[in-house]
Amino acid sequence: MRPVAVATTEGAHVDDDWPSLHDALAAEEIDGQLCVWDDDSVEWDGYELVVIRSTWDYTKDRAGFLLWASRVPNLFNRYPIIEYSTDKHYLADLEATGHRIVPTTFCDVGDRPTFPDTRFVVKPTVGAGSMDADKYGPDEHERAN
């Protein structure tokens, strides 16, 4: 069987559907192994392929994650796409090319943004899913800062 590393985050219940994926890979003669992306003991060059799957904690150290991704041999996910998609500023590019996006305003840390008089969401530009995101009402501008 061909060894393939499936990069993930350390922790329980990170990949609840891993057993199904593992079985599907095995059916294709692939020895899928979950490997924590920032575990220095992993020998990445021992795998025919490395696939990023559930590296949710990259948000705490994007620079370290990008450095790791730039050095991993046989990485299936292309580095320029990883770098681009790990920061939500790509949404501005999508909008500039005519794609509709949720109304978005980007702010730097320390900015005092103007919030809408309707419900709104604040989330980090480097984030995974709803991590560190929250929704606010029109009377919660101070809390949103």
Specify the residue positions occupied by each region the protein language model found.
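Active-site nucleotide/adenylate-binding loops and adjacent lid/helix of ATP-dependent enzymes
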Residues: 1-8, 68-145
